[in-house]
């Protein structure tokens, strides 16, 4: 038996509950996510996101004969991959989707394009101006006419390397007529929206009598046309619930199991009608509400509570402030949100190093600009590169040299200073310089790791260092293989972008202590006490990003994801999260 969850978090809690019920050691069932189920049954691997854009750029140039640089292509290349992914996950016919735009009446009015989309398209059309909508329409149609060719070439290019984007991998699995599933039974628990490709997989397993389904919902949003129940109502039509709320069997099983409260399956799905203590609080700023965590935990006597309290962050950027606001009495905390790498000193260090070797180092010279040198040496982690950093600062300030040379900066032939002020621009071409910059950043991180090896640095420092190294090394591999060919400005922008989107996972006992989690981590989990921060419009549900080359009417016609889908999903997350909660703030 394999239990399939929407995410991994629920499996950790289920293990704990099974142990409590049995009171002795038992064999734990196997757990996987639905994404892992697809990946286990495909010979393809999901490619690195940057690798995907690089290969898409090659397909674009081949199919359109527009020799556009990768840095100009990068932004809308990501958008196009998202559209391709959506087409495949919803099992739409790409040929029909891309050909129909030429015929729909929206093209008489291109207002559905956002300003950002227009700017992206304009990069390809140097003679286009905002006043010439007809010209934009003409050029945009020309671009659209190549999208099917790009889609086919891109998928073929990736498949030849044994790679795919996620939607293409999913589609490959469900269209494989020879697919054999490894396990005898798959138990799907707690899903809401199933994309068409996922529904086809579930349907196939059910027809082979290998799948059962457990749905989590409440009667309050199953009647009428409540948006929170939209997908559950649909799922129940195709995939019957093992806990049938209306069956005599479920009530009989509840009695046989000695359920003293008479909690039948019918009762399990009727929780929102019960009384709850709900408090609303307003705060003038995001930071003020984050600091309210301290007050809420203390006033409710929850500091030492284990496992039954959750703080949900609709805006996950509040995590650092929330962590600093926890009362000292709190003994155990489990954090399911990754700590943003951008919030660590390593992000600012990488920024400073890029500036030092860029605007801080005049090309073809042996000197550095004093401003960038001092800013780098004063960074809190500079002492981990060289313990002479403060001595160099004193020397520079006493001499008042605005362009110190390398020999002055590398005091006492110090190894760390020699790495820090290494010349990386004595190369013959752009690719060599980019490799030199990435190797330079990696060597700095290695130096920090070596110098802190014997020191008692905290775990966050160690994890931040490791993640920083991983990000840079990932880019180095793409440049080295020839997949990533960009100018240095674009490379620097990519480095910082990756740091901004990378999180550091926390490790701890998952079912112990106060839970601090994002919205998605609440799926399948129930808590008696919940504090939801940033429960505002624009935060939950989040402002919808509809950046796409496919207009709403076509998306709707071919069953692609629209704003309607996203609103229904957000509504379900909210109502499901609170349905069994007793104290909500």
Name the predicted role of every residue range:
Residues 381, 563-585:
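C-terminal accessory regions
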Residues 1-554:
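Nucleic acid-machinery interaction/catalytic patches
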Residues 559:
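Conserved active-site neighborhood of enzyme catalytic/cofactor-binding cores
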